[in-house]
Amino acid sequence: MKKQKVDKEDILIMTYAENGTFNIGVKVVGKGTAEISQFEPGLLVDCLGPLGNGFDFEGYDNVILTGGGTGVFPINFAYETLTSNGKNVTVCEGFRNASQVILNKPSYILTTDCGDCGIKGTVIAGLDTIDISDPSKTLICCVGPIPMMKAVSAWADEKGMNCLVSMEQRMACGAGICLCCTVKVKDEGSDGFKNVRCCKEGPVFDSREVIWS
């Protein structure tokens, strides 16, 4: 097998098959992701993971999955996993415009900032179309840019719903040593906050605990 060295990159699982294979989603933004996008079949790749925690859906009858940007990759994975287990799932995706839309299914709620595809507006416009009969039994999970997750967190709080967010901080070492992936969360200590590691304590957090900048 061929082996190729590239810099470490945070990778998001997009789909998973029962035969042990999975697909990843990559957005080319630099040298490392550009190299990954050119990988050919048969290349040997070293992976470290999965890192940290994940979404906990236990105790909820309904789940709303919200994604934007590269956040739609894990949202798609969660959708396939939940629906295969009989969960009632609603997906809302947000993009800047039609040219950036990926992984959209007919059952998904689609929004674009400029309105050239789907509902015009942010994902909040899409979430407002969902009929939520029992907020206490509905969980919303969100992955995407910080401003989007902050807005979804506020929306969920207003509706009286629990919200989990998956922070996309870059994980340099993946072992909890380098502290590059810290997130500021609320704490009862004297400072009122503490820094926790995405690769260990995260990347999924209760949105009410995150201190949004």
What name fits each language-model region?
Residues 74, 146-147, 168-203:
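Local cysteine-cluster metal-coordination motifs and their immediate loop/turn environment
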Residues 1-2, 47, 183:
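A generic structural signal for residues embedded in beta-strands
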Residues 120-121, 196, 208-211:
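Short, charged, solvent-exposed linker or helix-capping segments at domain edges/interfaces
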Residues 21, 44, 196:
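A residue-level signal for beta-strand positions that form part of recognition/binding surfaces
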Residues 1-41:
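Ferredoxin-reductase
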Residues 31-170:
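FNR/FR-type flavoprotein reductase catalytic core
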